[in-house]
Amino acid sequence: RNQHGDEGRAGGHGSFLDDMGSATDLGRRAAQAVLRASDGRGPPTALTAAILAHLHVESEAPLPALLGARGDERTRTAQLAPVVTAAAEQGDQVSLDILKDAAAALAPSALAVANRLGLKKPTIVAVGGLVASSPLYRDILHAALLRLIEDASVQGPVHSSAYGAALLALR
């Protein structure tokens, strides 16, 4: 929000069209990395064993059906995000690269809003389940944001989402 009360938004238009940096995006990137590792197009990754265990399967073969053909693919895919962050915290380079790539894809949304609202030194509030649950991803996202908008300050929400919902309900 700028000094005139104008608000801006960029991104967040659903998992099919635009969900860069979300839990679903991380899960999709992780599944892609596992499939590429399995056929030799990508490097080996700790994600393979972690995702197979998480999904209770013995090989990569059922991943496309499990994550894309049952109508609940967005939820199932998003549920892989904690697997990615855990593997990154354990030093898996592929997982760390996924976090960095997702944050780099999300950060331009904040820049677009800052530019649209004419904010030179914006305060960016990073919210969402993934940001809240993973200090590592939050730090990577903060760094990506500061690379794009040097004078920005990045913080978490001041109030809970329930507080925000209550305020909206009062309007």
Predicted region positions:
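Phosphate-binding/catalytic loop of phosphoryl-transfer enzymes
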Residues: 1-44
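ATP-binding/phosphotransfer module of carbohydrate and carboxylate kinases, centering on a glycine-rich
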Residues: 31-171
